[in-house]
């Protein structure tokens, strides 16, 4: 696995950062975001876009001509903005997850070191009070996909609850530079 750090800066100010890896999980090219934080300002969305664009650029270099799975743990519904432009994002409101999708949630939670805490029907990792990584993104006036907040109804982020989410970056979208913009 490659450990990669991405920073989003505005002048001298650090506006966001992420730690991710590019690896193959069972042969599948994967971009795993272990930790990402974006300042909670009016410019938060542009910082998130810059971070994701850099990660997609790296994924293209590592896995040319291949679809890449983006997987992470979300703290808030706004975190779904990181999946803009991706295909088959899971979980999604009103969608009954298939066995293969639940298997991917288990693989990702195992990779994140918390497989025993995953409810593979809801994709929620139950917190145990310890520090837990994930994608922390909140921005004023950000538009989130309708209904995703239902995944966070019984959610306690301060306890360490996280939502395992993933989607597919298509090879042609990576090559065309259309993701993260």
Across the structure, where does each feature detected by a protein language model lie?
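Conserved acetyl-CoA pyrophosphate-binding loop and the N-cap/start of the following alpha-helix
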Residues: 42-51
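Internal, hydrophobic cores of structured domains that mediate oligomerization or house catalytic pockets
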Residues: 31-37, 51-69
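Terminal substrate-recognition subdomain of acyl/acetyltransferases
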Residues: 1, 60-181
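A conserved beta-strand-loop-helix scaffold within acyl/acetyltransferase catalytic domains
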Residues: 1-41, 59, 74-76
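Generic hydrophobic/packing signal
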Residues: 7, 37, 46, 70, ...
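Short amphipathic alpha-helical surface micro-motifs
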Residues: 13-19, 50-55, 144-151
């Amino acid at each position: 696995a490659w450990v990669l750090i991405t920073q989003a800066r505005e002048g001298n100010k650090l506006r966001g950062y992420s730690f991710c890896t590019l690896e193959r999980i069972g042969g599948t090219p994967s971009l795993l975001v272990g930790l990402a934080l974006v300042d909670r300002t009016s410019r938060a969305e542009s910082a998130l876009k810059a971070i994701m664009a850099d990660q997609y650029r790296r994924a293209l270099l590592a896995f040319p001509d291949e679809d890449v799975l983006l997987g992470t743990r979300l703290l808030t519904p706004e975190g779904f903005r990181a999946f803009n432009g991706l295909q088959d994002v899971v979980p999604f409101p009103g969608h009954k997850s298939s066995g293969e999708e639940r298997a991917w949630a288990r693989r990702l939670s195992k990779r994140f070191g918390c497989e025993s805490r995953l409810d593979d029907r809801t994709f929620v990792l139950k917190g145990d009070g310890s520090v837990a990584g994930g994608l922390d993104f909140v921005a004023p006036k950000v538009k989130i996909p309708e209904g995703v907040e239902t995944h966070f109804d019984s959610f306690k982020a301060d306890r360490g609850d996280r939502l395992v989410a993933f989607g597919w970056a298509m090879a042609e979208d990576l090559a065309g530079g259309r993701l993260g913009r």
